[in-house]
Amino acid sequence: MGALQWLSITAAAASAVSALTPEQMIGAPRRTEVIPNPSGDTGLFSTSQWSFDTHSESTWWSLIDLQSGKTTTLTDDSDIEEIIWLGSDNSTLLYINSTNAQVPGGVELWIADSSDFANAYKAASLSAGFLGIKSTVTDSGDVHFILRGKSYPNGTAYNDQLAETYPSTARIYDSIFVRHWDTYLTTASHAVFSGTLQSSTSDDGNVQYTSSGGLTNLVNPVKGAESPFPPFGGNDDYDLSPDGKWVTFKSKAPELPLANNTAAYVYLVPHDGSATAFAVNGPDSPATPEGVEGESNNPVFSPDSDKIAYFQMATNTYESDRNVLYVYSIADDTITPLAKDWDRSPSSVTWVDGDNLVVASQDLGRTRLFAIPGDAGDDFKPTNFTDGGSVSAQYVLSNSTLLVTSSAFWTSWSVYTASPDEGVINTLASANEIDPELSGLSSSDFEEFYFDGNWTTLQGWITYPQDFDSSKKYPLAFLIHGGPEDAWADEWNLKWHSKVFADQGYVVVQPNPTGSTGFGQQLTDAIQLNWTGAAYDDLTKAWQYVHDTYDFIDTDNGVAAGPSFGAFMITWIQGDDFGRKFKALVSHDGPFIGDAWVETDELWFVEHEFNGTFWQARDAFHNTDPSGPSRVLAYSTPQLVIHSDKDYRIPVANGIGLFNTLQERGVPSRFLNFPDEDHWVTGQENSLVWYQQVLGWINRYSGVGGSNPDAIALEDTVNPVVDLNP
């Protein structure tokens, strides 16, 4: 595998630049963040790749030399779930094997050497499924570790394969959530468990590790707590102190109704569970900053194990409030904000040393790294030391530089070193220079632009097609992002990759209107009660700016598409004169009937957006209802409606209702449904069909289908079309 990986570099360099197709983009290798060993000379990562020939996925683990960038394959064992550096030296690894010979549904912990992986040995057998392992070697030589899994109400680990079944399929609820994202809730919850691997030295001097005792559920003793919290909770929700004595985790406020509140606390607990976890910033903690009641996230221990850095929002019920960086001192039981007035909302934090930190934050359509000293005052304004692309992970190397994993519009994976003093130091690898599927992609295919919106200057992105010629005209593909508190950013986007759209023969425009994130909290906050006001006006002004500025963009044959909030906007556009500016529309998982918001899972979202429940703020719900009779009577632009059955954020009835309405109005329309997908389409085979239908639909009406012989057509999808029309 390793030799083939490096042969691909030559192939990529030698191949001609070709259009990026859905098959190429979806089937290209997908790599994880690179995790360095203790000395910082070797990194570890995994790669997965889907084959449309075999309809299966291959996964392998690799090592990368952090000086030369050269990679070698460590293992392609498909049973391996995760691998981490154990921390005892620079070559010992700890991994989770996803099978257990003795316990169906259980997993095993194995120890291996990176130079002799085949001779790994089993260190522990675990009775249930677990993920997200973190470990440290203590002063005694033993390994303390934590991982996450499901828990029964009594605190024991939940095993899906051994769980009790009932004669009836009935589900009974006395509280909400009933369902969340893509899952109906059960009595099982998520928890962080701790354990120990005891060290011993064999006769030949080799250190061996074996399980010492069982696992301890650190979350369950706190009534109502859950960590990580689904659906997006993960490894960032908990941490193990470097000395192995403490564990910190995040949980939603257990005393508040889950579906109506975003409040969450950071907890601290001894690794052995000898005391019950307590919320360091909960309502009963004297250290809690006054008026700070929103979500907490990303707790991380300092290198000396004495402090915890974390983020918290001020406002409960507002999921897109500004994250502020705080540091909790274990010894002093105090909480200190850092750069409190900084007008950005950082999303991850890393300790460079005991006094200085680095955070990643959205910033002007990218995710950049910023340095923050431990004594930063409220008015400290961090300066970015990375620029283009979007950082997904950062680790401190032994020389205090950072190992960064990122992506961009033009590369799915980039690895480099950087520091606050020097910026980007050395690029080690980039997927567009490794993978034949991505060869020819470059930053020159993308650029940003600024335009005057409803009340402020706004930013957007332009993506150019293959062999772009400014003397020619290309139909506009106008993409509207979801959220609404989100942004089109310089990052690899599997679900809505602008270059895949562009290489059909479009110039793609992606504006960031009111509500977008990364441009200051005022712009984000301004979306409340303003979906069809400033945000809608921003989109019309973005279209007008493009129409007036770029001669090579054909707005007469333009198309528009968007997911979620973007899909709402598409249907709102359909009911307005602006809808006649487009030849075709595509809406993915969008709301249709205002009152149907009562069916959503996270009620805090809609009740914040519209400033009340659907009975308290009925006018606000109706003011953003694209199904109003006067709007429906204007529907006339061909529209593809996409909605999946497991979307519990915006249930599928919204999509069916919209499609029914379009059909009864006689508007050319099609309904695309995935019974096994949620608010996103992530399955590789489903994603291919999604792109075929979306691109086929817009190509049919924009003229691209006639001008580009290689353009995707609706007929490229092999699934049958149900058409019951006489």
Curated annotation (Swiss-Prot):
<feature type="signal peptide">
    <location>
        <begin position="1"/>
        <end position="19"/>
    </location>
</feature>
<feature type="glycosylation site" description="N-linked (GlcNAc...) asparagine">
    <location>
        <position position="384"/>
    </location>
</feature>
<feature type="glycosylation site" description="N-linked (GlcNAc...) asparagine">
    <location>
        <position position="454"/>
    </location>
</feature>
<feature type="glycosylation site" description="N-linked (GlcNAc...) asparagine">
    <location>
        <position position="90"/>
    </location>
</feature>
<feature type="glycosylation site" description="N-linked (GlcNAc...) asparagine">
    <location>
        <position position="530"/>
    </location>
</feature>
<comment type="similarity">
    <text>Belongs to the peptidase S9C family.</text>
</comment>
<feature type="active site" description="Charge relay system">
    <location>
        <position position="647"/>
    </location>
</feature>
<keyword id="KW-0378">Hydrolase</keyword>
<protein>
    <recommendedName>
        <fullName>Probable dipeptidyl-peptidase 5</fullName>
        <ecNumber>3.4.14.-</ecNumber>
    </recommendedName>
</protein>
<feature type="active site" description="Charge relay system">
    <location>
        <position position="564"/>
    </location>
</feature>
<keyword id="KW-0720">Serine protease</keyword>
<feature type="glycosylation site" description="N-linked (GlcNAc...) asparagine">
    <location>
        <position position="611"/>
    </location>
</feature>
<dbReference type="Pfam" id="PF00326">
    <property type="entry name" value="Peptidase_S9"/>
</dbReference>
<feature type="active site" description="Charge relay system">
    <location>
        <position position="679"/>
    </location>
</feature>
<dbReference type="GO" id="GO:0005576">
    <property type="term" value="C:extracellular region"/>
</dbReference>
<feature type="glycosylation site" description="N-linked (GlcNAc...) asparagine">
    <location>
        <position position="399"/>
    </location>
</feature>
<feature type="glycosylation site" description="N-linked (GlcNAc...) asparagine">
    <location>
        <position position="97"/>
    </location>
</feature>
<feature type="glycosylation site" description="N-linked (GlcNAc...) asparagine">
    <location>
        <position position="154"/>
    </location>
</feature>
<keyword id="KW-0645">Protease</keyword>
<keyword id="KW-0964">Secreted</keyword>
<dbReference type="InterPro" id="IPR029058">
    <property type="entry name" value="AB_hydrolase_fold"/>
</dbReference>
<dbReference type="GO" id="GO:0004252">
    <property type="term" value="F:serine-type endopeptidase activity"/>
</dbReference>
<keyword id="KW-0732">Signal</keyword>
<comment type="function">
    <text>Extracellular dipeptidyl-peptidase which removes N-terminal dipeptides sequentially from polypeptides having unsubstituted N-termini.</text>
</comment>
<dbReference type="InterPro" id="IPR011042">
    <property type="entry name" value="6-blade_b-propeller_TolB-like"/>
</dbReference>
<dbReference type="InterPro" id="IPR001375">
    <property type="entry name" value="Peptidase_S9_cat"/>
</dbReference>
<dbReference type="GO" id="GO:0006508">
    <property type="term" value="P:proteolysis"/>
</dbReference>
<dbReference type="GO" id="GO:0004177">
    <property type="term" value="F:aminopeptidase activity"/>
</dbReference>
<keyword id="KW-0031">Aminopeptidase</keyword>
<feature type="glycosylation site" description="N-linked (GlcNAc...) asparagine">
    <location>
        <position position="260"/>
    </location>
</feature>
<keyword id="KW-0325">Glycoprotein</keyword>
